[in-house]
């Protein structure tokens, strides 16, 4: 199983960051790689089990399912159902933690998935830098870093 871990400190209060990412359908509002997104079947975007269907800026479509959402812990876990990436059994978690020294937020985005040995390094780079770090960097820019 391949594991990816990316973290960052966002110079914004945790409630503000959580408000930006909480909706499972908000990805297109803050992630630069996402062209458009919708929740299938017009389900609520915070309903565990709902499916996010989005198109990438560079082409390609991804479908993801919300597995867990906690306002108390400020954490969201989801899986990929369909992706152009050569991965299987993908589960990711985006977690926020209040930084007590200042009005900041620690964000960590992790994933575990299976892929072939030959794709492992590329998928770690794609998910870690292309998805997670670019998303966290965009949040930092949007929220004032």
Model-derived segments and their meaning:
Residues 106, 112-145:
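A conserved amphipathic terminal alpha-helix motif
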């Amino acid at each position: 199983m391949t594991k990816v871990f990316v973290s960052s400190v966002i110079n914004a209060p945790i409630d503000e960051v959580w408000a930006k990412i909480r909706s499972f359908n908000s990805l297109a509002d803050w992630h630069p790689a996402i062209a458009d997104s919708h929740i299938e079947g017009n389900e609520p975007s915070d309903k565990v089990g709902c499916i996010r269907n989005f198109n990438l800026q560079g082409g390609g479509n991804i479908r993801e399912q919300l597995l867990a959402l906690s306002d108390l812990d400020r954490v969201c876990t989801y899986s990929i159902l369909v992706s152009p990436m050569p991965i299987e059994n993908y589960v990711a978690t985006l977690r926020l933690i209040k930084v007590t020294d200042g009005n900041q937020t620690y964000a960590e985005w992790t994933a575990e998935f299976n892929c072939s040995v030959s794709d492992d390094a590329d998928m770690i780079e794609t998910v870690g830098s292309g998805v997670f770090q670019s998303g966290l960097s965009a949040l930092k820019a949007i929220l004032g870093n």
